[in-house]
């Protein structure tokens, strides 16, 4: 399911319910993650780091209303420069999930935090 389809699904009742649960989780878990630079990879139409206190936040995706347009496995970000990375369902739709994880590892600060949202692949929602 491409991310456009996922965004459409989040507009439907069941998807909106899940999106609200994910937002509530992120609002509770990310406010006190300290740092200077945060990025959200994918779903740029949603501000999923809205409660985080990091002032320099970037939304990166291949298109849409983003701060940086880039392939997610080729980020134009300096090595070891990101304090918080959010991947909202990015691994499910990545052409090369391992390449994406390697790229995230490259840009993360040594004590940086990575938050991954995804469907349980063994649940009914995770089935394709």
Where are these predicted regions, by residue range?
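Class I SAM-dependent methyltransferase Rossmann-like catalytic core
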Residues: 1-31
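Short glycine-/acidic-enriched loop or helix-start segments at secondary-structure transitions
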Residues: 49-50, 96-97, 125-126
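Conserved class I S-adenosyl-L-methionine
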Residues: 113-128
